[in-house]
């Protein structure tokens, strides 16, 4: 999916919501545990319930890898289900990969040749040669970690050099030599608030993947105010606040209501920016 297609889908659905599939076997409704594949059964129900109100899904690989072969099979089945039934959805593998060139090449093959996601999150710490193998796929996206939502982000990402330039700003500046805004996005945590103004000075046209809204306490209003550009430029992720909104047999319907509430708020911000003609 290219940038224009993503933007058109945002306008069509009046939403820039990404639903995070951080599926924890210990947190899904008890009645699903009798299913042959409880993780996939949960994901399928969440997807069917929320697809009308979001433009992207983001499975977090750690939750699937922790279950071994069965977990990875559930992940691959989830991606295949999305591809077959919801081809307009942007699929992000939240894997935070990044290693020396030949290792990154294998990671890229796994996600883009085999599993066929649209994007993968990548850590930039090892530099250009660890990122480039992901960029040889012209239809795929790299989502580079820039300024994350966790408290520990201040340990490195906010440190300044002698000229006052912060590390995350170096990442933004240098990485734009590797790819343009048609193939690269950045992870910026919702808890960073007004830092979006600084981000947009460095990356005015890039899409930003924004975790941290919902259970982590980030403000959607603040993200939209400071981070939205003329093509929206945002994919705001919500995981726990949607997928674990309820643990009874009604969990999917409650998740749908939670996603719809976020979508309606997003439609207002898109309208205020002049991206869509009227509120949903």
Curated annotation (Swiss-Prot):
Q: Where is the active site?
A: 96
Q: Give the top-rank taxon of the lineage listed in the UniProt record for this protein.
A: Bacteria
Any Gene Ontology biological process: 'de novo' UMP biosynthetic process
Q: Which UniProt keywords apply?
A: Decarboxylase, Lyase, Pyrimidine biosynthesis
Q: What class of enzyme is it?
A: lyase
Catalytic function, reaction form: orotidine 5'-phosphate + H(+) = UMP + CO2
Q: In which pathway does it act?
A: Pyrimidine metabolism; UMP biosynthesis via de novo pathway; UMP from orotate: step 2/2
By its UniProt entry, which PANTHER family does this protein fall under? OROTIDINE 5'-PHOSPHATE DECARBOXYLASE
Q: Which family does it belong to?
A: Belongs to the OMP decarboxylase family. Type 2 subfamily.
Q: What is this protein called?
A: Orotidine 5'-phosphate decarboxylase
- Species this chain originates from: Parabacteroides distasonis (strain ATCC 8503 / DSM 20701 / CIP 104284 / JCM 5825 / NCTC 11152)
From the UniProt record, report the name of the gene that encodes this protein.
pyrF
């Amino acid at each position: 999916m290219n940038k224009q297609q993503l933007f058109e889908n945002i306008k069509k659905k009046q939403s820039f919501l990404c639903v995070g599939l951080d599926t924890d076997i210990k947190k899904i409704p008890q009645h699903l545990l009798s299913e042959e594949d409880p993780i996939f059964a949960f994901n399928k129900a969440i997807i069917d319930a929320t697809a009308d109100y979001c433009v992207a899904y983001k499975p977090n690989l750690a939750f699937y890898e922790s279950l071994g072969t069965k977990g990875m099979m559930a992940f691959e089945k989830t991606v295949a289900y999305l591809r077959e039934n919801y081809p307009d959805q942007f699929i992000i593998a939240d894997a935070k990969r990044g290693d020396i060139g030949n290792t990154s090449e294998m990671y890229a093959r796994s996600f883009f040749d085999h599993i066929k996601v649209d994007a993968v999150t990548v850590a930039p710490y090892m530099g250009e040669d660890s990122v480039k193998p992901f960029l040889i796929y012209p239809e795929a996206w790299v989502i580079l970690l820039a300024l994350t939502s966790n408290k520990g982000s201040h340990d490195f990402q906010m440190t300044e050099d002698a000229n006052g330039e912060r590390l995350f700003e170096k990442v933004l500046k240098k990485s734009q030599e590797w790819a343009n805004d048609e193939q690269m996005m950045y992870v910026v945590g919702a808890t960073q608030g007004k830092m979006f103004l600084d981000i947009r000075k460095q990356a005015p046209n890039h899409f930003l993947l924004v975790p941290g809204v919902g259970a982590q306490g980030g403000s959607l209003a603040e993200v939209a105010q400071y981070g939205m550009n003329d093509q929206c430029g945002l994919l705001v992720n919500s995981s726990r606040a949607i997928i674990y909104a309820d643990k009874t047999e009604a969990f999917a319907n409650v998740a749908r209501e939670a996603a719809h509430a976020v979508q309606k708020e997003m439609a207002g911000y898109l309208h205020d920016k002049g991206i869509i003609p009227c509120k949903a």
